């Protein structure tokens, strides 16, 4: 019975370490996706057309 418990404990420990590495990698990928420059470019793409349309409407062109 003791060798079985020891094996299960070892598997649990290794699985926990593996899960921790996967979580760190996932967090690193999310940080890369949330790059501030990319967010600024996305914001410009959304805001500039709206501002352009608003100016066109105000100026009557």
Swiss-Prot record:
One of its GO terms (cellular component) is extracellular region. Expressed by the skin glands. Residues 1-22 form the signal peptide. Its main location: secreted. The modification Leucine amide is found at residue 59. InterPro entries: Frog_antimicrobial_propeptide (IPR004275). Residues 23-44 form a propeptide. Keywords: Amidation, Amphibian defense peptide, Antibiotic, Antimicrobial, Cleavage on pair of basic residues, Secreted, Signal. One of its GO terms (biological process) is defense response to Gram-positive bacterium. It is found in: Secreted. Antimicrobial peptide. This is Temporin-CDYa. It comes from Rana dybowskii (Dybovsky's frog). The lineage of its organism: Eukaryota, Metazoa, Chordata, Craniata, Vertebrata.
């Amino acid at each position: 019975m003791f060798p079985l418990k020891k094996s299960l404990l070892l598997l649990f420990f290794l699985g926990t370490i593996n899960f921790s590495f996967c979580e760190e990698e996932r967090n690193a990928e999310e940080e890369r996706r949330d790059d501030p420059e990319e967010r600024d470019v996305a914001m410009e793409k959304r805001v500039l057309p709206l501002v352009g349309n608003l100016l066109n409407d105000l100026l009557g062109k």
